[in-house]
Amino acid sequence: MATRRMRQGAQVASDEAEETQLTKLGQDLSKTFLNKDFADIQVKCGKKTFDCHRVILAARSCVLKTMLSSDGSEQREMEIEIVDFDAEVIFQMLQFIYTGKLDDPFYDAEDIDMATELLRAADKYELDSMKALCEKKLASFLYVENCLRVLILADSYQAFELKKDALEVINRNRKVVFKSEDWEKCVKNHPKLAVEITNMIE
């Protein structure tokens, strides 16, 4: 018994030490965010330019890794230009790449715009853990009034957990949902999804 307790205690101590080291590693890595020291690539978005590190971008996103490959024009020009997102969205995405966290404005936001854009960015750049955070945030905004719009968003970007949550809201409030203008638009513009919804209800 004593030997077993000693082994268990040693394992706990080892796990705690490993967790401490991982926390320290994350803190050290976060210090490089927007730090020009050793930066070797610039990410441009609108009027904003972010100094970044190729190895970190490539390690965190296989899409960015492809963009930074030796065959790409970005390699020669030493920059990536992003034109399909606002600078604030790219700032938040880069912060997540470096720190694994999103900024307070994301968590404090009272509308779904930023979470929607970050979900879109996470899907495009294949940042699965960021995508999961965005799904969770968007799920907190789910109401009868917007459940169909959120469902369409989730379906478009393969946000499966968010889609499941939206379907549950629709199912619980189907009488109201099926009489809404959003439902008419869904049937017209997203017929396959409308069939999926009705099959689920039946």
Which residues are covered by each model-predicted region?
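A periodicity- and composition-biased signal for non-globular, repetitive helical segments
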Residues: A10-Q11, R60, T66, V169
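A structural signal for well-ordered alpha-helical scaffolds and beta->alpha junctions
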Residues: L22, D86-I90, K163
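Canonical BTB/POZ domain core
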Residues: K31-V144
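Eukaryotic cytosolic interaction/assembly regions at protein N-termini and domain boundaries
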Residues: M1-L29, D37-A39, K185, N189, ...
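Short, functionally important structural connectors and interaction interfaces within domains
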Residues: A17, Q21, L25, S30, ...
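Generic alpha-helical structural element
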Residues: S14, E18, I82-V83, D123, ...
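BTB/POZ-protein C-terminal extensions
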Residues: E79, D103-R120, L133-E202
